């Protein structure tokens, strides 16, 4: 995300998508911590074989998510609320809805329930994270953290 000059907060999105569970599977078939569906995974060259599915690979799926947000940012004029809603509900759905309603502000749009609640849910999660872990957000924080887990 840093290398693509994306807002670093977007790297927290898997908390909303999957609680950072790299093996997560949704009721609609989206997989991995970024919850890529088949079509988007294919679009970003994530292999979906019988033995290996790159949507379960945290590194490959994170790289794909960064590319996807780079594209969404460009498409929605770097309005990250719109980009987040597009990530959740689909960019074509969002663009069509914006055109039908004649609105280009996320907060003015009337969307399906899940994308309508997605941005507030993400912002609430960020607020909780910033209050609980303020040292992750001070100016000049390291560009990466090394975390060991067993």
Question: Which positions does each model-derived feature cover?
Answer:
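Extracytoplasmic and endomembrane cell-envelope/extracellular-matrix remodeling and assembly machinery
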Residues: 3-4, 48-51, 55-76, 81-150
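Short beta-strand->loop
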Residues: 23-24, 55
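Short glycine-/small-residue-rich flexible loop motifs, especially phosphate/cofactor-binding loops
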Residues: 11, 38, 70
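Solvent-exposed loop/turn segments at secondary-structure junctions
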Residues: 18-21, 40-41, 90-93, 129
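Short, functionally critical alpha-helical segments immediately adjacent to catalytic or ligand/cofactor-binding
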Residues: 6-23, 83-88
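Short, surface-exposed glycine/acidic/tryptophan-bearing loops
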Residues: 24-45
